[in-house]
């Protein structure tokens, strides 16, 4: 009888032991405030990060966040270096062939920023100017 009770209690204890939440590795690129940026304590912050944190929490996952360079973020995802992105990402047909996307949670348009007094009427007006852009973004001209 004692042995049966002991085995039953051991089985119950094993069933009641908390299971550690699975940790998902999430990549971001903290160069796009207010969506992804480093706060004054150099901690990743922003809407995309808060959104991913809450979704994973509600799904029962822990999150390991990595701030990575944008020009390698998709290669790292494809290589399995991380499980998902918490980064402002344009959904393109090419990217849809390689990755799954959530429903978009915000929209944005591309714009050219010029000093006051300079005017452009078309992309052709930019030919004689020096134009800067982040590597690997869809806004590259």
Pin down the residues of each PLM region.
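Periplasmic-binding protein-like
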Residues: 30, 106-114
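Bacterial N-terminal signal peptides that target proteins for export
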Residues: 1-9
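Flexible hinge/capping segments at coil-to-helix
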Residues: 114-131
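Extracytoplasmic small-molecule ligand-binding "clamshell" domains
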Residues: 22-89, 97
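Secondary-structure junction motif
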Residues: 132-141
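Ligand-binding "clamshell"
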Residues: 93-104
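Sec/Tat signal peptide C-region and signal peptidase I cleavage site
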Residues: 17-21
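Short, well-ordered beta-strand segments
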Residues: 25-28, 113, 130-133
């Amino acid at each position: 009888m004692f042995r049966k009770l002991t085995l039953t209690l051991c089985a119950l204890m094993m069933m009641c032991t908390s299971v550690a939440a699975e940790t998902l590795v999430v990549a971001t690129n903290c160069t796009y405030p207010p969506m992804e940026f480093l706060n004054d304590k150099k901690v990743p912050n922003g809407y995309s990060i808060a959104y991913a944190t809450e979704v994973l929490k509600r799904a029962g996952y822990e999150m390991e966040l990595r701030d990575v360079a944008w020009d390698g973020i998709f290669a790292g995802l494809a290589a399995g270096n991380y499980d998902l992105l918490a980064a402002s990402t344009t959904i393109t047909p090419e990217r849809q062939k390689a990755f799954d996307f959530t429903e978009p949670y915000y929209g944005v348009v591309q714009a050219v920023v010029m000093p006051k007094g300079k005017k452009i009427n078309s992309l052709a007006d930019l030919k004689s100017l020096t134009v800067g852009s982040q590597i690997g973004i869809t806004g590259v001209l």
